[in-house]
């Protein structure tokens, strides 16, 4: 094949699932083949994430416009990349990082850089007439991830007063991804009927989970147990529970307390919940700045359940290495837009995996119809994925893509939960 190079890059301002602006990017090759990507955006963000560039113009989208990021793609990144091989992902990502020149991509914006990075990979895959997961992962990419399904939303993803952000189910006994989706959907619809019977709201939050007014985190977990059982499954055997506490959102940095409680109290609360419920994964149980609290949590529960660092690590290899050295957590949440390039995302996964940490590919609360993370989860054999509830089309699109990938791979497809504490 003759050299296939980057000929043009187009970008535009579009809307995400919350109605806020984000970027669409299209990388076009000299053969006319192209790749497209839409960039997600988070509501609950880590303080060390790569910067998502916003215009800060109060006259447009309440300051959340991304026209400057669009301009950076077309006026800075295109000239820097034009003529480079569409297959040289590492070099292209390095060129964009150098063009930005900052530690957190604040000059050009991680949203601008990531859009180009993902669209480039898709253009390369399309050129070879391969699906993205096969282009990136090769012949050994055949593991379908266990989904962590966010059925009840709280925290910064809803306005219902729940302290924790996500109350999830994990269909651990499913023999396939397709069956895992079925199990999740059946529990979702059963939960809806239970909420209706109790005259609780069936409105949904940012990630498609229900957002009823509940008195406590325990009440949310009780509802999940009731839905699992009524749907015909056994809690802890067929379907386990998982939490995203997003503890940084209720952490007081001045007195280092969690809604007035100490780190030890917070660990005790989580331990008690694990004693009462079939929970096998907790994300961001302590705040990202509370290293001592994380050490206590890891010492207390690290040999019982999966402890996932999201805000703690923000998909940053340096922070992951630091956390591993200190014995913090035992799993890493992977969000490409936290770091800003596909190359750095892959490096974070490689580092975590080689050190025995599980990895979970994740969406953001502000999503689009883009299904790239489904392909990435399979490409890198993460074994787990977070992509929301069983409602809202921007969430369902990822599940539908995973179902299609499983069918494409055929008999070699393996549904594998990478959580080492799963009881299935």
Swiss-Prot record:
* Residues given in the record as Mg(2+) binding sites: 244, 283, 310
**Has UniProt tagged this entry with the keyword S-adenosyl-L-methionine?**
no
InterPro entries per record: Enolase (IPR000941), Enolase-like_C_sf (IPR036849), Enolase-like_N (IPR029017), Enolase_C (IPR020810), Enolase_CS (IPR020809), Enolase_N (IPR020811)
Whether Plastid counts among this entry's keywords is no
Major subcellular site? cytoplasm
User: What domain of life does the native source organism fall in?
Assistant: Bacteria
Biochemical pathway: Carbohydrate degradation; glycolysis; pyruvate from D-glyceraldehyde 3-phosphate: step 4/5
Task: Give the reactions, separated by semicolons, that this protein catalyses.
Answer: (2R)-2-phosphoglycerate = phosphoenolpyruvate + H2O
Any Gene Ontology biological process: glycolytic process
Residues bound to (2R)-2-phosphoglycerate: 165, 335, 364-365, 386
- Record's cofactor remark: Binds a second Mg(2+) ion via substrate during catalysis.
Q: Which UniProt keywords apply?
A: Cytoplasm, Glycolysis, Lyase, Magnesium, Metal-binding, Secreted
One MF annotation (Gene Ontology) recorded for this entry = magnesium ion binding
Gene Ontology CC entries for this record: cell surface; extracellular region; phosphopyruvate hydratase complex
Stated EC number for the protein is 4.2.1.11
Top EC class of this enzyme: lyase
Per the record, the similarity remark reads: Belongs to the enolase family.
Q: Which NCBIfam families match?
A: eno (TIGR01060)
Per the entry, what this protein does is: Catalyzes the reversible conversion of 2-phosphoglycerate (2-PG) into phosphoenolpyruvate (PEP). It is essential for the degradation of carbohydrates via glycolysis.
Question: Protein name, please?
Answer: Enolase
- Lineage, opening ranks: Bacteria, Pseudomonadati, Chlamydiota, Chlamydiia, Chlamydiales
